[in-house]
Amino acid sequence: MNFMACGMGQNKQYEEQSKKIQDLMKNIKYKIAVMSGKGGVGKSTVAANVAIGLSKKGYKVGLLDVDIHGPSIAGILGIRDAAIEFNEERMVPYPYSENLKVLSMQCLLNQPDDPIIWRGPAKIGVVRQFLSDSEWGELDYLIIDTPPGTGDEPLTVAQTVNGCRALLVTTPQEISLADVRKSIHFCKRVDLPILGLVENMSGFICPTCHTLHNIFQSGGGKKTAADFDIAFLGSLPIDPNVVISGDSGQSIAADSPVNAALDQVLENMITQLKSK
């Protein structure tokens, strides 16, 4: 076997796929990777509701879930049983609403509880295939939900999607802030611009009296953003109804106090993007 010829062939395919990705990304104005240093901070819930919120403002939005081992976007949006259609060899994202399309690994599984037992090269290949073989069309925003940490999936997005920016999600506790600091250093090392930081689970809204109680220490996200000279996009409180909505596949209710906080995050995010 001619190993050199084989390697050259693989390099050519890789380069062709990279060009294909860049050509497709030219049709998308803003690309945003939603990242967190650790799991359990509500990153996917933030990603889903940012996408929904932008779509309700009239923007054309795509939501791509590249959390290969723990995809949850389809569950949050209530489309676990939605099958991804194919146009020849291209994936057609699920039309969640008039302005929002969704693509998740979860929609490609035969059974929702099937585990995905893959090593790095397979995951990298699938993320690149999601980016190269999906029919998004023209979008204002592509929101990319990445798994927590600084592993293969966020690294692949950072190195592959030109013009991508990171939206970092943390909670107020120091254990989460320590990990989001690692994410900040990751972004700096791979030259991924940081759009801003969101502090999630910032206080608890009592379902009875509707007042905000700081069950964790608060303000850590804002201080971290200031320490690293990045934009602080806002705080999102805990509302038990948001958990119920997510488990039942619904977005944040219009009358939830979280909705107003989310809208402020969106406005800050849009302002940041327009200022770049």
Placement of each model-derived feature along the sequence:
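Phosphate-binding loop that captures ATP/GTP phosphates
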Residues: 60-62, 66-110, 117, 124, ...
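Residue-level signature of catalytic and energy-coupling elements of molecular machines
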Residues: 28, 39, 65, 73, ...
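Glycine-rich phosphate-binding loops of nucleotide-dependent enzymes
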Residues: 103, 127, 146, 159, ...
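C-terminal lobe/tail of nucleotide-utilizing enzymes
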Residues: 1-19, 186-276
